[in-house]
């Protein structure tokens, strides 16, 4: 049968590769080598073979990837994709999602010796590219690849002394990722999704989202000429839905929770074979998100803060932030790692609840918070998130909607940063952590603002309050000032 001939050919290819590079295997039957290679080969041996194959021949490395049904493009800096549950390592092709053995989430692994050599030969200080792609050695992409047209990354890191004084923090920095093209950190993941989709020869991308991932995908895909199908809960703010429609996405509002939205998107992606941008399913999304950490480190001259505060929903962002810092540490660019502050809404905090209990077993929760971007009662990336919190000796903080609104006001009035609710949650967590003694007042802290307030104007007005409304009459103006107890400063000379 044709299928049988094809399988024998694959076995022969694998067997010959193993026999060529590993002495002493000529006495072992080819079918046995195939089984060992595909199912139970030790991770260290796999990595050694991958490196040997790459260094010996790009063609041989491509053969190794084709054995797993993936791209023949050899990424010099990537050694494979490792399952976070069973430990299986597979080649990092552009369309990989979850572990083929157990269904676990995959994590992209790197050759840090290669990264060190590459950066030594091309220092970051010599690079003109100010986008996330300036860190290409740390990303699963070819150096010669054409990247998306939108300027993703390079967002400002502000020294926020006035806000720090209000929060009681000696050294506070605000990383404003709301300055990305579609106004959120999620642009970093979506730019990576578009890049990998193009690499895989795909023309349509889909995802489920509470809003920001959806708008970022729609915008980045539009710039690359790709079509998008976006599934969002019907509760999504109109501003975010408007972005989707303006970018030309096919938008499906789902009457249900984020879990319901995720499920129907997964079924549709499977049915029509679209490229899957869902962050918990696609391991490359975290690789895009981690660039926020690479930027923070470089903007601070690679001198690490004591803490980095991150708002948490699905878990992919905090996991990406941690991986970025770990990658820098493994590459020798930083000498210590910061502790993470994991911030969730008290009305929806399954990851923090599990972290506080010291367990990897989380329990679904209701989505009772106005911070829609982190309203995820059934997180899809809990393993990586919980490991990030644990490995970083992280601080766990849950904040109420009222505390988030206060942080929105404080960011605006003392730092000039307009944050959506989820974007302000990290700063709300910093404030609460100081007040409760979880972090020291003399600590250095970076708080990541993940999204811009223009995405959710209704809740911005709710937090800031309504403006005065008067008839065009000076007496009415004075009455309005008086009713609000305003003391009006005069600039007129005496």
Q: What is each stretch, according to the model?
A:
Residues 5-10, 19-20, 66:
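Basic polycationic patches enriched in arginine
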Residues 62-72:
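Short, Lys/Arg-enriched N-terminal segments with co-localized hydrophobic residues
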Residues 27:
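Cationic, low-complexity basic patches in intrinsically disordered or flexible, solvent-exposed regions
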Residues 72-494:
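PLP-dependent amino-acid enzyme catalytic core
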């Amino acid at each position: 049968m044709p299928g049988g001939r094809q399988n024998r050919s694959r076995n022969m290819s694998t067997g010959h590769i193993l026999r060529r590079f590993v002495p002493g295997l000529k006495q072992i039957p080819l079918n046995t080598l195939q089984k060992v290679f595909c199912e139970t080969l030790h991770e260290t041996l796999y990595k050694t073979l991958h490196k040997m194959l790459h260094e010996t021949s790009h063609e041989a490395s491509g053969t190794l990837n084709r054995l797993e049904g993936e791209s023949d493009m050899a990424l010099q800096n990537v050694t494979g994709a490792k399952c976070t549950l069973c430990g299986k390592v597979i080649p990092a092709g552009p369309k990989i999602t979850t572990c083929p053995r157990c269904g676990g989430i995959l994590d992209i692994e790197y050759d840090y010796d290669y990264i060190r050599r590459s950066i030594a030969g091309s220092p970051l200080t010599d690079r003109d590219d100010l986008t996330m792609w300036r860190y290409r050695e740390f990303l699963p992409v070819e150096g010669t690849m054409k990247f998306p047209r939108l300027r993703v990354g390079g967002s400002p890191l502000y020294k926020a002394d006035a806000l720090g004084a209000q929060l009681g923090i000696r050294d506070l920095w605000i990383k404003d990722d709301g300055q990305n093209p579609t106004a959120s950190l999620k642009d970093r993941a979506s730019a990576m999704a578009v890049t990998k989709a193009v690499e895989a020869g795909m023309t349509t991308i889909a995802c489920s989202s509470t809003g920001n991932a959806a708008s970022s995908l729609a915008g980045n895909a539009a710039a690359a000429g790709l079509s998008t199908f976006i599934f969002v809960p019907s509760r999504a703010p109109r501003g975010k839905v408007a972005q989707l429609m303006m970018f030309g996405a096919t938008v499906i509002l789902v009457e249900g929770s984020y879990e319901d939205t995720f499920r129907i998107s997964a079924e549709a992606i499977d049915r029509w074979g679209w490229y899957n941008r869902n962050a918990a399913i696609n391991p490359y999304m975290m690789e895009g998100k981690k660039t926020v950490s690479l930027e923070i480190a470089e903007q601070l001259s690679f001198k690490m803060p004591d803490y980095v505060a991150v708002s948490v929903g699905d878990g992919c962002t905090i996991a990406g932030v941690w991986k970025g810092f770990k990658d820098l540490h493994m590459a020798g660019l930083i000498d210590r790692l910061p502790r993470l502050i994991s911030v969730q809404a008290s009305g929806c905090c399954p990851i923090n609840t599990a972290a506080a209990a010291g367990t990897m077993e989380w329990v679904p929760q209701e989505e009772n918070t106005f911070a829609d971007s982190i309203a995820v009662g059934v997180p899809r990336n809990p393993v990586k998130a919980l490991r990030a919190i644990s490995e970083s000796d992280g601080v766990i903080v849950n904040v109420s909607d009222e505390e988030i609104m206060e942080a929105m006001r404080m960011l605006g009035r003392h730092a000039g940063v307009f944050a959506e609710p989820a974007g302000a949650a990290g700063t709300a967590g910093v404030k609460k952590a100081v007040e409760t003694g979880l972090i020291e007042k003399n600590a250095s802290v970076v708080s990541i603002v993940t999204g811009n307030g223009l995405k959710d104007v209704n809740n911005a007005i709710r937090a800031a309050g309504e403006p005065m409304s008067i008839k065009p009459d000076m007496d009415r103006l004075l009455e309005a000032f008086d009713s609000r107890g305003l003391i009006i400063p005069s600039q007129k000379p005496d």
